[in-house]
């Protein structure tokens, strides 16, 4: 067994040094929860403490998990990374390219040719609840061409919005939130 108080103290020092509002950490084993640590607040008023059920947005960390899942499926023979995305999502395409040009690998490696876009920001703005109204939120709601509430609405936008691609699939790497939303 490890000294949980030493780990607790180290995590508190780290959270304070980083000026973090709230932190949750856990160690799991095959048998279940071995250790949990919660620090700080889950609301701006500092009235609700972080607990084991607090949900944190993991944002772009989900890209690593998505890529890992795709690689596991590929290693098990359940996913071909070089399969066209349109095999799974028939309405998907990238401007100026045949539908079968973009593969799962292209999306995973940020090489689909899709330029930086706003659909995920629109989706966050249109589908989040409880966010205080601010200039960014107002502008996102004003400019969103559709609610972006489903993957089909994101795909429809990517397929038909008339953007210029950065290059052919596989040519240029450009970080793509939309690519991972589709993946």
What are these regions (language model features)?
Residues 1-30, 132, 158, 166:
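Beta-lactamase-like hydrolase cores
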Residues 22-24, 36, 55:
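A common structural microfeature
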Residues 31, 107, 183:
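Conserved hydrophobic/aromatic pocket- or pore-lining residues that grip, position, or stack substrates
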Residues 32-33, 78:
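Residue-level signal for well-ordered, solvent-exposed loop/turn and beta-edge residues enriched
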Residues 33-39:
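Amphipathic coiled-coil signal-relay and dimerization helices
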Residues 178-182:
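Hydrophobic mid-domain F-helix/FG-region of cytochrome P450s
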């Amino acid at each position: 067994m490890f000294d949980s108080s030493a780990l607790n103290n180290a995590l508190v020092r780290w959270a304070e040094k980083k000026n973090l509002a709230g932190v949750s950490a856990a160690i799991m084993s095959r048998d279940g929860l071995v250790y949990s640590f919660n620090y700080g607040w889950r609301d701006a008023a500092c009235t609700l403490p972080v607990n084991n059920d607090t949900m944190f947005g993991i944002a772009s960390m989900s890209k690593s998990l998505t890529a890992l899942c795709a690689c596991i499926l590929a290693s098990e023979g359940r996913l071909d990374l070089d399969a066209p995305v349109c095999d799974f999502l028939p309405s998907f395409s990238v401007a100026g390219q045949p539908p079968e040009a973009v593969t799962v690998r292209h999306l995973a490696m940020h090489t689909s040719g899709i330029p930086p876009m706003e659909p995920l920001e629109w989706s966050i703005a249109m589908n989040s609840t409880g966010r205080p109204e601010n200039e960014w939120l107002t502008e996102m709601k004003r400019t969103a061409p559709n609610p972006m509430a489903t993957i089909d609405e994101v795909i429809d936008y990517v397929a038909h919005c008339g953007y210029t691609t950065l290059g052919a699939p596989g040519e240029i790497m450009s970080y793509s939130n939309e690519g991972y939303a589709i993946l």
